[in-house]
Regions:
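Extracytoplasmic "Venus flytrap"
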Residues: 2-23, 46-52, 155-156, 272, ...
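Beta-alpha junction/loop-to-helix N-cap segments that form part of ligand/metal-binding clefts
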Residues: 13-20, 31-106, 187
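Short, charged, surface-exposed loops that flank catalytic or proteolytic processing sites
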Residues: 39, 296, 314-328
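Short beta-strand elements at the ligand-binding edges of bilobed clamshell
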Residues: 47, 106-135, 182, 248-264
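Periplasmic-binding protein-like
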Residues: 62-77, 95-97, 147-150, 200-211, ...
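Extracellular/periplasmic Venus flytrap/periplasmic-binding protein
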Residues: 117-225
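Extracellular/periplasmic periplasmic-binding protein-like sensory domains
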Residues: 224-303, 384-390
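Solvent-exposed, acidic/polar segments of extracytosolic/periplasmic ligand-binding ectodomains
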Residues: 333-391
């Protein structure tokens, strides 16, 4: 079993959950039973160094000298597609996560409906993010149009896409989107975007910015006398404040701004591990006990990655044959600690869909906390706070 993870570089904090899960589950991964036979399993971890070129080389090493039958990966707008493309080219099965499925397909030069032979993914869609955010917008009275703070890179291009970006979902719900203008990351200022926000009287803002860029935008909007009633932001804002930015006060500032985000996993999700029955709450507690760090959303998905890999090796016609493992993944339906992963009926081939709920960064006794404030897509997830618009 091969793993490509960002152990170093700017994405390293997001590799921590996968490294932790591999350590925690090591005793359960030493062997798999398949068809009455036991097979020893070796786990080989390679560092992507948070770089697409290094990630491709990591796959080549796993496929060649390590002889991996399966590769797992997560994290990185540029790095994850590099891993999956390299696996496709090398003819090695791959399971990945933490990337909207439309971005997963588009970043690889394909269209929805395309079938990859070797690579499988589980996540949510941009349409799911739009639906969760629209649910939150509709709970804010008299907020007007939605200002879209989107960058000039892959995220912004996809969010603007006329078929699978935000517009098809939000226009059907009668929301008016106002593009505030593309910007380059990291931004050095948002005066033009703030001007458009004022011009259109938008009381809501949605974004996929880094925490640092979003805080800068909010600061400059306030300096101009503007205070959006609600800001919704995906991407980096889904992670705890201690893991996302070298400026620890940024998340306190964004909690003051009442920034809302998406939630794909939390300690309150009603799921258990297929390996040992561990609940989401137990996994989050163990992570804090063992690392001293707060739980973070990728933790549950990292665990589900490993569950999926072990399942595929257990049910494949021949776990030592890559084609058999890929075929097993294609037919997988598995209840995991991240929910039911079903690759037989996804929105497009090779995809298993995860539902989203709405969250908001709020002040807590230990600093900013991510509260679940909307659960219409998954009522089994308990609410842990009320949506609080800025005043």
């Amino acid at each position: 079993m091969g793993v490509v993870a960002p152990l170093t570089g700017r994405l390293a904090p997001l590799g921590s959950p996968l490294s932790y899960v591999l350590r925690r589950l090591a005793p359960l991964l030493r062997q798999v039973r398949n068809g009455g036979r036991r097979h020893d399993v070796t786990v080989a971890v390679r560092d992507s160094r948070s770089d697409p070129g290094a990630a491709r080389q990591a796959v080549r090493d796993l496929a060649g000298s390590d002889g991996a039958n399966l590769v797992l990966t997560m994290a990185g707008t540029r790095v994850l597609p590099a891993v999956t493309d390299a696996c496709e080219e090398s003819g090695i099965p791959c399971v990945s996560t933490t990337f909207p499925w439309q971005a997963y397909v588009d970043a690889r030069g394909a269209e929805p409906g395309h079938r990859f032979r070797w690579t499988y993914h589980f996540a949510w869609g941009l349409d799911d993010i739009a639906a969760v955010f629209a649910d939150l917008w509709e709970r804010v009275d008299d907020a007007g149009a939605v200002g879209c703070l989107w960058n000039d890179d892959l995220q912004g291009q996809l969010l603007r896409h006329d078929r699978y970006g935000f517009a098809p979902v939000t226009s059907a719900r009668r929301h008016t989107l106002v593009d505030l203008g593309a910007y380059r990351e990291p931004a050095d200022g948002f005066h033009a975007q703030v001007g458009r926000l004022r011009e259109h009287g938008a009381g809501l803002v949605t974004s996929a910015a880094t925490a640092t860029d979003l805080a800068l935008f909010h600061r400059q909007a306030r300096q101009a006398g503007l205070r959006p009633r609600l800001i919704t932001c995906s991407r980096w804002l889904t992670y705890p404040h201690t893991h996302t930015t070298p400026a620890p006060d940024v998340h306190g500032e964004l909690a003051d701004a009442c920034v809302a985000t998406l939630v794909y996993w939390s300690p309150g999700h009603p799921y258990r591990s297929s390996l040992d029955g561990t609940t989401c709450a137990e996994l989050a507690h163990a992570y804090r006990q063992d690392t001293g760090a707060a739980w973070l959303q990728p933790l549950g998905l990292a665990h589900a990655l490993v569950e999926t890999a072990r399942h595929a090796l257990t049910v494949a016609a021949d776990p030592t044959d890559r084609a058999s493992v890929a075929q097993a993944l294609a037919g997988t339906t598995l209840d995991t600690i991240a929910g039911t992963l079903d690759w037989t009926c996804g929105p497009t081939p090779n995809i298993a869909l995860l539902p989203l709920v709405g969250g908001q960064w709020q002040h807590g006794p230990g600093g900013p906390r991510l509260a679940v404030v909307g659960n219409s897509a998954l009522p089994g997830v308990p609410l842990t706070g009320e949506l609080t618009p800025a005043r």
